[in-house]
Amino acid sequence: MPQLAGKLILAGLIPLGAWVLHGFASCNGLIQMFEDFGKQTVLSDGVTDYTGAFTGLEGLDRLLRTLLNFFWPVANGHDWALSLHAFMFAGQGVPLLVLNMLEGARPGNKSLVVSYVTVFGILYMVVGLAIMAPLYLFLHLLTSRTATAPSKAKVAVDPNTAKAVGFGVFVGYVLPTIFMSLPHPSLLSTDTKVLSVVFWQAVPLWASVCAYFASTALGQSATSRSSSNLPSALGAVYAASLIIATATHVATFAISANLSDTWSGIFTFLIPPNPFNTDMRISSFLEGATWFLQWDYTMMSLAYMVWAIGIRHGVEVPRSSHHFETLGKIALRSMAKLLVMGPIGAALSLVWERDQLLWQLDSESGEKGEKNRSRRMSRKWMFS
């Protein structure tokens, strides 16, 4: 029942995400500004010249110019509220990529549409997380065997694959994000800064490519499914992702508290405007980019929290078991995690819990089976 509710919520978030992201942007004037900047050789700050030709393919270059103009103020710290939001968003990007890439590697998702995580990652960047995140997660709950009938065998990830995912996210996402954020012209020339922002648009691809080569070099581990404990490599990837997500989330609010005069002001940078007020107009491109990013983050967060709670509750546990938790208790714990780790960090934590629970249940089932076999052998010996 909770997963059915999750599917319905996620299905409803898809058109809502389309409106708050693109419909609202069209009404408030941001889309028109995008189109205007796409025709110019000056970036969205109004002063930086650039060529705008990156690949020689006009259609692709037009898309890259649009993304570049959007992320240019984000990468340059032109506004403290936008910079804070982008910093927090970037931190949540680590568990986001880890979650998706691990889903692509799970046996229960093999050959399913949700295993094509690189394609979905690019669509996240191009179409927007507010639309593509609920769509991907809806398809996951609908089709994935790790969601419909979870078991240790279906969610098990080879330890070396887990290491490769961690390596891929660090080299393909974390490093490009840090490099893109370096100031110009003090550390980066304008041309280098522009190219770094353009390069960053394909971080889901770079992360997947790096993970592929790392996985090929490491090979397959022989202990991925035979161990009675969750592989330490997988746990290490989960833990590292949560450390980054938590550190950036807490640091964001600490900085905001230092910059704000009131308690309510701490959360101002996070709260998006009413998307159904079609009379609202942006006063600048910077303001429009901030609103866009706020809604992208909000919808993504809601989608992943709904999905993760459904995934965690989807493990069948008898009510008599000490592992059993009600949906309400899981939801309350999830909200507490969200406050500390951020939404995607909380979602990853719930998936980690799910994995650990499946390993424990499998181990207990094996021990129970071994005891039953021992009893049968004892009876057979007594009456022989």
Curated annotation (Swiss-Prot):
Keyword Transmembrane set for record: yes
Signal sequence coordinates: 1-25
Residues of this chain annotated as glycosylated in UniProt: 109, 258, 372
Biotechnological applications listed in the UniProt record: Ascofuranone is a specific inhibitor of trypanosome alternative oxidase (TAO), and quickly kills African trypanosomes in vitro and cures infected mice. As an essential factor for trypanosome survival, TAO is a promising drug target due to the absence of alternative oxidases in the mammalian host.
Spans traversing the lipid bilayer: 82-102, 119-139, 164-184, 194-214, 235-255, 291-311, 330-350
GO terms under cellular component: membrane
Involved pathway(s): Secondary metabolite biosynthesis; terpenoid biosynthesis
EC code: 5.4.99.-
GO term, biological process aspect, one: terpenoid biosynthetic process
Top EC class for this record: isomerase
Catalyzed reactions: 16-hydroxy-ilicicolin A epoxide = ascofuranol
Bilayer topology: Multi-pass membrane protein
Keywords for this protein: Glycoprotein, Isomerase, Membrane, Signal, Transmembrane, Transmembrane helix
UniProt KW Transmembrane helix keyword: yes
Gene Ontology MF terms in the entry: isomerase activity
Gene disruption: observed consequences: Impairs the production of ascofuranone and leads to the accumulation of the product of ascH.
Induction: Expression is induced on AF medium.
Compartmental location: Membrane
Function of the molecule: Epoxide hydrolase; part of the asc-2 gene cluster that mediates the biosynthesis of ascofuranone, a strong inhibitor of cyanide-insensitive alternative oxidases and a promising drug candidate against African trypanosomiasis. The first step in the pathway is performed by the non-reducing polyketide synthase ascC that produces orsellinic acid by condensing acetyl-CoA with 3 malonyl-CoA units. Orsellinic acid is then prenylated by the prenyltransferase ascA to yield ilicicolinic acid B. Ilicicolinic acid B is further reduced to ilicicolin B by the reductase ascB.
Recorded family membership: Belongs to the membrane-bound ascI terpene cyclase family.
Protein known as: Terpene cyclase ascI
Gene name per UniProt: ascI
